Every structure is written in C-alpha cells, then in structure tokens.
Design a protein with these regions (language model features):
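PLP-dependent enzyme catalytic core of the Aspartate aminotransferase-like
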Residues: 86, 94, 163, 335-337, ...
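Conserved PLP-anchoring active-site segment centered on the Schiff-base-forming lysine
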Residues: 116-138
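Conserved glycine-rich beta-strand-loop-beta hairpin in the small C-terminal domain of fold type I
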Residues: 282, 298-307, 318-331
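Active-site PLP attachment segment
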Residues: 225-261
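A short helix->loop->beta-strand "cap" motif at the edges of active sites that frequently abuts
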Residues: 122, 143, 198-203, 230
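Active-site phosphate-binding strand-loop segment of PLP-dependent enzymes
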Residues: 152-217
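N-terminal small-domain helix-loop-helix segment of the aminotransferase-like
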Residues: 12-105, 112, 285-287, 391-392
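Structural signature of PLP-dependent enzymes
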Residues: 262-266, 285-307
Length: 392
C-alpha cells in the first residue's frame, strides 16, 4: 500500500536550483556517451590549481589529534572570532569579536538572518540577476519578495528605482559584492547607504563571499559607511578565499543584539560548527596569505584568458568581471535565448554553462561561465564553442 506522506505545504518552496540542472544534464551526458564534458557550469574550484592550502589541512589533522571533537561555544571559538573581527576591520568596518558569529557556510548565515528578521507579509528586496537559492527562506515564511533590476552593462543598482520599491513593510535589502553571477563590484555603497538612512526600519544583508577575490578594484563594504555598521549584516566565507567550499564554514558580522539572536538560532539548530573545522579556518586566516595572493593572481589570468576566448566566439560578447570566478557573457548576438543556447551548447559541443535566466529574468541573453578550472579546459571549451558556431 502506498504511503501518503503528510508533507508541509512550505516544503514546496524547496526546489533544486536551476543551475543544478545544467550540472545534472552534463553529468548524465558524460556518463551515457563517454564524451568529456567541459564543465564551465560548476560554481566551484576545479582541478589541482585550487586545493585547500597544505597548512590548513595540517591544522585540521592536529586539531583532531588535540581533541577538538566536542561541542564548543555556539557563536564560535574565541580565537577565530577575534581573527574574523580583525580581518573585517581591514575593510573599514571596525569590528569586535562579539560582533562575529561563525556559521556553517555563508548560506547558513544568510538563512539565519532572513529567518531572524522576516515574517509573513514583510518585504525583502533582492537584486535581479542575483542568486535565487537565497530567496527560499523568505518564501518559506511567506514574506513578499521584490526584485530590483540591475542596470546593464555594469550591473549596478538604479537607486531611484530601488527607493521607489521601499515601503513601510520593507525590512531587508540584499546586496552582493562582488556579485553573483556577473562578478561586478557594487560601486556606490555610499549612495546606497544614504538611501538607507532615509528608511530607518530598513536593514541590509551584504553578501560578500568573494571579498578577497577581486582583481582590478578594491573590495568595498557598505558596512564601512559611518552609521551603516548598525544597519548591516555582512556575510562572508572561507570557501572562496581559501578554496574550502566543501568545509562549510563562514561567518556573519552584525551589531551585538543581532549576533545574540543569531547565536540562539544557531545553538537551537546545529549547536555549533565543528570545532576542528573552526581550527582549520583559524589556521587559514591567521597563517600565511601567500596562497590567497597567488591564487587570486592566477584567477585574474584565467579571467583574462576566458574573456578573450569568449569574445572570439561567434555571437558572444563578454566584459571583464571585477572579481569572483564567473564571467557573464552576452549571447544575444547568437539569436538564441539563454536556455536554448545552453542546451544546444552542451548537446552539440559538450560544453556545459548555466543559462543567465537561472539567476533571474534580467539574465536573459546571458550565460554564466566559470573560469576556476585548468587553462587546458578553458582553451578546449572555447575552441568547441567556436567550432559549434551557434548562431541563427
């Protein structure tokens, strides 16, 4: 007899992210045909060029031997909170350890922040294009989601449009710099802050997971604008800076009253982030930074290689992102929609990318391409794209 499971209606908000579809199709095609797929769709580091630094691995092993396998204080190990506070202060947001909470990745920090502030009927504004998985928990509590379109080609906020969307019910504004999926920095945090000051009930969640992966311009945080330290939750992670994506450790910086609420949430949900992983993160942040400097320089070279290659593909145009490890290429010259181009590319050329519409309606006409892979894969992928000549 079939079982009828009494699922909550809210679980319907949890669906696989659209970018996962590209990965699944590519993986299935690779398995069924034996064809080597060039994986430009993965939002992760690939290959031996990007592996967690050796001293971080060594610190993890030592932490296990030293007995860091028990519960720890929920907000995080004191030494790690101190290190994060010092690092955050370098960007101009003077931070005390008690303003830091260690989380199971940036997504966890964002989830807790959304659930701490939002309830049914509240409004939250997300950028478009953006990162739709971040919206799930707002939907879960039945908050009203608004999308502010970013202006092309540099993907910035139209402040007049943004402010027109704010009502007395608007609690949160989500910003992301460098941005997913296009890699551009938010260039005017001071102007955004000025707008926020006109709306005293508005809080900002600033997703800054690529804060240390910028190339030509320095990273800036809205939390460094005087007065915004009390209005902003800054979210960051060890994933991108130290190639620790699978370790699931990040943090949030916020005023102490907010950290206190997040700490209760964390302790009642996951209890704490694994102590030995926190020791690894401390080793990453407090140890030599040569790896990060070298890998950021390497990513810049790969960015330039990828952008030059994409601009040689028929019907494709691509500008240089300021940071992150994605390029957001304009494929309107091909005559195809984003999804059509994505599907045809993996089927005919064995190159997997993500349709821009996976990140919102403003992504139509674009594809996201990851360049955190080998030079050989970049060259081979671009060569296949050129040979496929996907132009109507």
């Amino acid at each position: 007899m079939a079982v009828s499971y009494p699922f909550s209606s809210k679980i319907s908000h949890f669906v696989p992210p659209k970018q996962w579809a590209s990965m699944r199709i590519a993986r299935d095609l690779e398995k069924e045909t034996g064809t080597k797929i060039i994986h430009f769709e993965k939002g992760d580091y690939q290959g031996p060029d990007f592996y967690t630094p050796d001293h971080v691995l060594a610190a993890t092993i030592q932490a296990l031997k030293d007995g860091y396998v028990r519960y720890d204080p929920g907000p995080g190990l004191p030494e790690l909170r101190e290190a994060i506070a010092a690092e955050t202060s370098k960007f101009g947001r003077k931070t005390k350890p008690e303003e830091v909470i260690v989380t199971a990745g940036a997504k966890h920090a964002l989830t807790m922040s959304l659930l701490t502030f939002l309830e049914e009927g509240d409004e939250v504004i997300f950028p478009n294009p953006g990162y739709p998985p971040d919206e799930v928990w707002a939907k879960y509590v039945r908050a009203n989601i608004k999308h502010v379109p970013l202006t092309k080609p540099d993907w910035q906020f139209d402040l007049e449009k943004l402010e027109s969307m704010i009502t007395p019910k608007t609690k949160l504004l989500i910003i992301n710099t460098p941005q997913r999926p296009n890699g551009h920095l938010v260039e005017n945090p001071e102007a955004i802050a000025e707008m926020c000051f006109r709306h005293p009930n508005l809080m900002v969640i600033s997703d800054e997971i690529f804060s240390h992966v910028t190339f030509d311009k320095p990273h800036k945080t809205i939390a460094a604008v005087p007065g915004m330290e009390d209005r902003t939750i800054v979210i960051d992670t060890f994933s991108k800076t130290y190639a620790m994506t699978g370790w699931r450790i990040g943090w949030a910086v916020a005023p102490v009253p907010v950290i206190d609420k997040l700490s209760i949430f964390l302790q009642d949900s996951i209890t704490n982030v694994a102590a030995f992983i926190q020791k690894a993160a401390y080793a990453a942040m407090s140890g030599p930074q040569d790896w990060t400097v070298e890998k950021t320089a390497l990513l810049k070279k790969k960015r330039d290689r990828m952008v030059a290659g994409l601009n040689s593909v028929p019907g494709v145009k691509c500008d240089s992102p300021d940071g992150a490890f994605y390029a957001f290429a304009d494929i309107t010259g091909t005559g195809y929609t984003s999804q059509e181009y994505t599907d045809k590319l993996v089927e005919s050329a064995g190159v997997a990318v993500v349709a821009g519409t996976a990140f919102g309606s403003q992504g139509e006409g674009y594809i996201r391409v990851t360049y955190a892979c080998s030079d050989e894969d970049i060259d081979e992928g671009v060569s296949r794209m050129k040979e496929a000549n996907l132009v109507k």
